[in-house]
Design a protein with these regions (language model features):
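Short glycine-enriched loop/turn motifs at secondary-structure junctions
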Residues: 82-85, 180-184
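Conserved class I S-adenosyl-L-methionine
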Residues: 158-183
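A short beta-strand submotif of the Rossmann-like class I SAM-dependent methyltransferase core
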Residues: 127-133
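A conserved catalytic-core signature of glycosyltransferases
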Residues: 168, 186, 191
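Conserved N-terminal segment of class I S-adenosyl-L-methionine
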Residues: 1-121, 127, 141-144, 161, ...
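Conserved catalytic-core motifs of eukaryotic protein kinase domains, centered on the activation segment
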Residues: 139-140, 172
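A short glycine-rich, Lys/Arg-flanked "PGG" loop and its adjoining helix->strand segment in the class I
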Residues: 141-157
């Protein structure tokens, strides 16, 4: 091969974990625990209390107890796993500072970059939780597929979590005025309810939702569209499908 056509391999950076490190540093800078020391432990608002009650009732309904093993993906300081209790929880997170807080709270946890893969064996867990996590990941469809893979294929096996919904009327009005759907820099995926619902029902036979904020949450009797009138939503899904097939990545929402 002539010198003109040779790829300049000497320019390549030999740092395999560079992406992992950059993401970890980004989250650590965002947390800035020197300025906000309670960042990993504070319970802000009522969402967490409402969600944990919802999750716990769902797990109790599906006969989970201390014999069940749960994975908290993006566990931060381990607060929600501690609030839910009921089962044996372990956690993973990319943020070292968060993991230190979680360990002090008694949650067994390790550092893991789950941006594209959740590195556990097939059928390892009875419960998986991704609370306010999917919106931070570039390909949620891959993450949910990984959740399905590591869950045991039992009727009571459960996947619980929550996300903001960014296509409600208020956010649409923001876009019409030239603003972003979300001002949160850490949010890289913006869910509509339709997308979330189709994704969860593709992998699970039983899905239940709990609106956390928005007009539909304040006025449940009005039976308003979740796609337009819910800002934040929690879910509990059970009965993972044994052979869900392949998710259509060309689907348009």
């Amino acid at each position: 091969m002539s010198g003109e056509n040779r790829f300049p391999e000497e320019l390549l950076l030999n740092e395999p974990d560079r992406g992992h490190r950059l993401i970890r540093e980004f989250y650590e800078n965002y947390a800035d625990i020197a300025r906000t020391p309670d960042y990993y432990t504070a319970i802000r608002g009522q969402h967490e209390k409402i969600k944990t009650t919802f999750y716990r009732r769902w797990l109790e309904r599906n006969a989970h107890d201390q014999r069940s093993l749960g994975l908290d993906v993006g566990c931060r300081g381990g607060v929600l796993a501690g609030m839910i209790g009921l089962i044996r929880w372990i956690g993973v997170d990319i943020d070292d500072a968060a993991l230190e807080v979680a360990r002090e709270a008694g949650l067994p946890c390790v550092e893991m970059d789950f941006t594209t893969a959740i590195n556990f064996q097939n059928a390892s867990f009875d419960v998986v939780m991704t609370n306010e996590v999917l919106e931070h990941l570039p390909y949620p469809a891959i993450t949910v597929r990984e959740v399905h893979r590591i869950l045991k294929k039992n009727p009571g096996s459960a996947y619980v979590g929550s996300v903001p919904l960014d296509y409600h009327l208020h956010r649409r009005w923001k876009v019409m005025r030239g603003k972003r759907l979300s001002g949160e820099q850490l949010h890289v995926h913006h869910f509509s309810f339709k997308e979330l619902d189709q994704l969860l029902r593709f992998y699970f036979n039983n899905v239940e939702y709990l609106p956390l904020s928005g007009t539909a949450q304040r006025h449940p009797r009005w039976r308003l569209s979740y796609n337009l009138f819910v800002r934040d939503i929690a879910w509990a899904a059970a009965s993972p499908k044994s052979e869900p097939g392949r998710w259509n990545v060309r689907e348009r929402f």
